[in-house]
Amino acid sequence: MIQRSLAALVAAALLAPSARAGDAERALPPEESFFRTLHAARRVGPVTLNGRMDEPAWQAAELGSGFTQARPSEGAPPSVQTRFRILWDDEAIYVGAECDDPEPSTDTLSRRDRFVEGDYVSFDFDTTHDRRTAYHFQVFSAGQQLDGIHYNDTDMTTDWDGAWDSAVSHTAKGWSFEARIPLRLLRIPDRAHAFGFNIYRILSRLHEEDQWRYRPLGRPGDISRLGVLEGIDGIHPVRALELRPYVGARLIRTAPAPGTTVPDAALGACSSVGLSPYRVSEACVGLDLRYNLASDLALVGTINPDFGQVEADQRVLNLSTFETFFPEKRSFFLEGIDLF
């Protein structure tokens, strides 16, 4: 009798979490209720990147709003309002947003592509609408940028660096920004189609994340659950040539063998045939290039790549037992990273 009672108690304890999980899943609205669509307007008139969105051209674009809180109160209205608009022309896509905040967090300035504590807005473009890959762009209230590539729906790398522009402006109501994303950075098929799109806002002091196209935390998928951006069609290939030269140098000094007397001049003197045997210098020059053949096809090449060097200009104090890892930043080796 006691054994049967104990078995029933254990079974009830095991079934309770699954029942609660099932109740939470059933409590979520159907997926169709989260779908969002926005229409991007073709730019008519100039847009100056000053962060204020005060040009008449912005008024022609549909106003996006109605964010939903993802954290900490999942599904609740946001604490403050966020409004955004999207423009485009033959060369770029423009994203502008106004972020209300009566008590903005202290801006933390940092290097590009560094996650820091602070307020920011990020947005994703799935330009091929394959629901697996997307370009990620992020603008902090302090003005710094971060970008990367989403792949396999839920994975992301920030190793990819795109050349795009943004500007931030602060007002008594909060802050706003304008961003210009050149089309030459994006793979866009020639055929007319919609983009996958979503925009997010982080409020650091409240530990809050607001989403335009709300993604419930209990359901898997990131890029497959983006909203839809319509109106960008008739784009012609931007045949831009991008060149990234680099120069590297290395100096090696070898100390003379013990007991060997070497004139001081020999350690640093140059001769007609080069440096002295105790000083050896090496120099290398290379080039990465990219040429857009079509809106979704690019020729990427490299000349004399330096396989032994990575970007290492950031000082890193490593007190752990693990080696310091520096991410790959050379564009040639990052092209197609979402495919391999």
What are these regions (language model features)?
Residues M1-A7:
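Bacterial N-terminal signal peptides that target proteins for export
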Residues A7-A16:
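Bacterial N-terminal signal peptides
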Residues R20-F340:
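Structural preference for beta-rich elements and adjacent junctions enriched in aromatics
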